[in-house]
């Protein structure tokens, strides 16, 4: 009897344990598999393949005509949904020229820009340099002077944490002469900039610089890691007349030829239709060229139209970029 009683008690204990285990499994929330974190993956799949920066030229009328302080650039760009800043040197020339571009004036420019970008959590991307001399002039002495005029901007870019300066290749209109002069001017400047960890970028910006195959040839001959292109979606007019552009390079061919050398990209825009598409430029087609080249850096919005206000044009360009970029994912 004693042995039977013990066996009976043992069976009861086992049954109770099994019942409690079943109840605890039923009530306890199921542990999610570790690889279920798909929302993040899904979110990334719907994000564009690039980051958004704002070219300050998009607000040049605000600064020059409406009296907007250029040092509010970071604040405005932040409010418009950008994360990167592309400064335009010419919008600060009033104060800098008055001080003859002294070291103190340049240091003040850098300090103010850094303070504002830090305050608003923005990234300084590059500085677009204009009016500092012709880097592609056939006159060696003038070319050297132009190169040296850019040194202070290389220094400023380095102090601001930018990765590059954008330069122009103004100068000769004779193809062979322009190529040779461009190679020399860029090599001199890129050599100086290399020690500062700054890239020297050439934008297709009129004249022979808008002849993409020639600009690509210049890049190949310079052959320096810190010298490249900044393809602009719209600046492919080689020669102008009183009626407009007399000779324009094929936009899509040009972007395709410049992208292998691209270290930055500029999204030019002029006007938009009712659906928000750019009326001259096929953004989906252009962005596919950019993506196929493996580019994943900043794309800078540069609105240059006259129908919309600058703020409206900036936002319209931003929205079109995001829309077209997402569609390529």
Describe every region a protein language model picked out.
Residues 64-77, 144-155, 247-255, 283-286:
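Short, acidic/polar
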């Amino acid at each position: 009897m004693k042995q039977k009683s013990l066996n009976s008690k043992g069976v009861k204990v086992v049954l109770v344990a099994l019942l409690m285990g079943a109840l605890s499994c039923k009530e306890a929330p199921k542990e999610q598999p570790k690889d279920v974190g798909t929302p993040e993956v899904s979110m990334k799949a719907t994000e564009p393949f690039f980051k958004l920066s704002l070219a300050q030229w998009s607000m040049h009328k605000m600064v020059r005509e409406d009296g907007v302080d250029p040092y509010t650039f970071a604040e405005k760009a932040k409010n418009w949904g950008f994360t990167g800043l592309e400064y335009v040197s010419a919008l600060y020339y009033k104060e800098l020229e008055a001080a003859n571009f002294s070291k103190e004036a340049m240091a003040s420019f850098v300090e103010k820009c850094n303070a504002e970008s830090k305050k608003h959590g923005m990234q300084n991307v590059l500085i677009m340099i204009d009016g500092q001399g012709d880097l592609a002039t056939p006159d060696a002495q003038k070319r050297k002077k132009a190169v040296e005029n850019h040194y202070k901007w290389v220094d400023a870019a380095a102090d601001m944490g930018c990765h590059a300066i954008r330069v122009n290749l103004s100068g000769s209109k004779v193809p062979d002469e322009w190529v040779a002069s461009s190679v020399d001017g860029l090599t001199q400047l890129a050599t100086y900039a290399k020690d500062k960890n700054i890239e020297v970028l050439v934008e297709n910006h009129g004249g022979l610089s808008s002849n993409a195959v020639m600009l690509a040839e210049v890049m190949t001959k310079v052959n320096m890691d810190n010298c490249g292109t900044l393809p602009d979606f719209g600046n492919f007019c080689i020669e102008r007349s009183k009626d407009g552009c007399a000779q324009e390079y094929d936009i899509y061919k040009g972007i395709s030829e410049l992208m292998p050398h691209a270290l930055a990209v500029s999204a030019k825009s002029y006007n938009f239709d009712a659906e928000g598409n750019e009326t001259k430029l096929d953004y989906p087609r252009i962005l596919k060229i950019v993506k196929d080249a493996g580019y994943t850096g900043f794309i800078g919005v540069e609105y240059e139209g006259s129908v919309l206000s600058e703020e409206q044009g900036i936002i319209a360009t931003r929205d079109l970029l995001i829309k077209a970029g997402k569609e390529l994912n």
